[in-house]
A protein has these predicted regions:
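FMN-binding flavodoxin-like domain, especially the glycine-rich phosphate-binding loop
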Residues: 1-3, 7-14, 20-34, 41-49, ...
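Cysteine-centered iron-sulfur cluster-binding motifs in ferredoxin-type domains/subunits
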Residues: 184-189
Length: 189
């Protein structure tokens, strides 16, 4: 399966490439010129993105909506990477993709080292980060083997996941993100 991803830190790139390679494909960044050709040429793709404050990045929303016609009839497997927990990380894109006429085959949530350094809960030691990566590698290998047998993981796609994502995180994180933005101070001197 070929993959298209957005990756700010390299985590989602790593995970999407690993799943694509394990299922006989390759992966490209949605920011590259090749992304639209991969989307056009593939009947089935993996779409990977990070979760930002329990939400889908704007660039991913824009990619899906701007190329909605190209997603029609495609089978899409969603990979969502996160620092902690997202609830419905895969469900966020799933709802958009279904509106475009895509068939969402499944979802895979992968915890990876986080890049946010000012939230104590997200800070990890190097050993903890290595353990997160090892667990993600194992989960990717298991998912790839299942996909080869026609069994797709369904992380983040149920109604309960949606409730957990909305009430457990998204509402709180939006308020928290606003506070962080208000505290941001930039010196122009």
């Amino acid at each position: 399966m070929n993959g298209i991803y957005f990756s700010g830190t390299g985590n989602t790139k790593y995970c999407t490439e690993a799943l694509a390679q394990a299922t006989g494909g390759s992966a490209v960044s949605m920011e590259s010129r090749e992304a639209l050709e991969v989307l056009r040429a593939s009947d089935e793709i993996a779409l990977g993105y990070p979760i930002y404050f329990s939400d889908i990045p704007r660039i991913v929303k824009a990619f899906i909506t701007e190329h909605a016609a190209m997603f029609r009839g495609k089978r899409v497997f969603i990979i969502a990477t996160m620092g902690l927990f997202s609830g419905d990380g895969a469900g966020l894109a799933s709802r958009l993709l279904r509106k475009c006429g895509a068939a969402v085959t499944g979802g895979l949530h992968l915890r990876m080292p986080d890049c946010i350094a000012d939230v104590k809960l997200l800070k990890k030691t190097p050993e903890e980060n290595r353990a997160l990566i090892a667990a993600a590698q194992k989960k990717i290998a298991q998912a790839a083997n299942a996909i080869k047998r026609g069994i797709y993981p369904k992380d983040g796609l149920s109604f309960l996941h949606r409730i957990a994502g909305l009430f457990g995180q998204r509402l709180w994180f939006k308020m928290h993100a606003k506070k962080l933005c208000e505290r941001l101070k930039i010196r122009t001197e």
